[in-house]
């Protein structure tokens, strides 16, 4: 199944979303594996009930394997727990997008609805109602996953599991440490994901702050909130909280959205600032102190301020505490607690594998974990030689103005191919629905109450390789519905689309996505790439 770890490989490293993915550019001759006679309790023992673990377990069972899946949620620093489904369903993608949607509604009501003829009196948001709606939907998904495992003939145990040796797992049912039981498995998959990190060197942070593990089930409205971090999680949380009407400040060490295209990152931040999110650049908390029902935050610039809520979103670490990996001498990156696994999901222990966020150098995205888990199961139990391809993986960030990306950033393309070999086509423009309400002021134009000086809300950007007939290696879009716009473009990039293919394609009018069919200005030309007139992303004549 797994090659000798000392064998030298020549992999092309493609960092699809600047999250350090691999590209398996060669077809490896894999050792075929068939389920042996039942010398183990199970053919496949999966630790972790997130997207990757569940997908791999069900795929293995579909090919005749006897599968056992463990899932147990250790409480957050504030005691928050949740059901099966992992981060994405419970404290990640799903609740995040629902709250983003709620915030987007609020922005439309407050900023745009009056101009479109709607009248609202005493518009007010109910945080508790939002949390109830979100959590009710999550519980329905938890239930569907349980029934899905059962119908797939995957045995499920709500137990805290750890490794005893390369084929033995011990566990504590429902986390009860008074009784330990063991099972054996021919293969073991670790798919425990990651958990948010709170720094040890900030006094009071672990005791008084929350993370994304807590915000989506917070019983009391967050009030005035400090978000610490520059990650996409930090910007998404601060964005929807601001849109819901809360006073939000973001404390940033240096740049936002490190690893993503920085022109797009700056545009996202600028839009958030225009909507009222405040940023403390280069300023971080040094100490948190409880003051009645508030939190006093002392900053690195010697200032201090009171907040109702402090949310840390500075990064995530692999959830491997208690797995007993050290006794097996498993290779782990100690700086982020991630398991070192190759492009085949193999660890340095032949019978143990790792997929999803807990694996080193893998994009932290649920669809990536699902695909990798399914492919691994097919290799183990179906004699497949399929290999996970980590190139051109799309992603979307659900900030107030969304950002979708696939492939290389402008900076990464310059680094890998040289600036002279890269051409960047781009255009800034205003979304049609927004520009109808928030028109930029002109001296001779008739004025009305909706005039507002706003920067161009949208950006369309293609990063191309000159020596390959301008093959597109990077797609970037800042604007509404970024995920929907980006998904189809990812397929085009995987099929090696070229700039001329975009030029020859007819756009759907009027949409923001059609802007990619009308990109003619390059960064190297030095010309303005701001659209002059038009209808959103398209031309009107």
From Swiss-Prot:
InterPro entries: FAD/NAD-bd_sf (IPR036188), FAD/NAD-binding_dom (IPR023753), FAD/NAD-linked_Rdtase_dimer_sf (IPR016156), GSHR/TRXR-like (IPR046952), Pyr_nuc-diS_OxRdtase (IPR001100), Pyr_nucl-diS_OxRdtase_dimer (IPR004099), Pyr_OxRdtase_I_AS (IPR012999), Thioredoxin/glutathione_Rdtase (IPR006338). It catalyses: [thioredoxin]-dithiol + NADP(+) = [thioredoxin]-disulfide + NADPH + H(+). Disulfide bonds join 88-93, 535-540. Keywords: Cytoplasm, Disulfide bond, FAD, Flavoprotein, NADP, Oxidoreductase, Redox-active center. GO terms for cellular component: cytosol; mitochondrion. PROSITE patterns: PYRIDINE_REDOX_1. Residues 438-452 are annotated as: Loop important for the interaction with TRX1. One of its GO terms (biological process) is cell redox homeostasis. FAD binds at residues 51-52, 71-74, 87-88, 92-96, 161, 357, 364-366, 509. Its cofactor is FAD. It is found in: Cytoplasm. PANTHER family: GLUTATHIONE REDUCTASE. Belongs to the class-I pyridine nucleotide-disulfide oxidoreductase family. There are 2 isoforms resulting from alternative translation initiation. The displayed sequence is likely to represent the shorter isoform. In Plasmodium, the C-terminal redox center, which acts as the active site, is formed by two cysteines while in mammalian TRXR this redox center is composed of a cysteine-selenocysteine active site. NCBIfam families: TGR (TIGR01438). Catalyzes the transfer of electrons from NADPH to thioredoxins TRX1, TRX2 and TRX3, which in turn act as reductants of disulfide containing proteins. Able to reduce nitroglutathione (GSNO), a compound involved in the transport of nitric oxide (NO); however, TRX1 is more efficient in reducing GSNO. Has no catalytic activity towards oxidized glutathione (GSSG). This is Thioredoxin reductase. It comes from Plasmodium falciparum (isolate FCH-5). The lineage of its organism: Eukaryota, Sar, Alveolata, Apicomplexa, Aconoidasida.
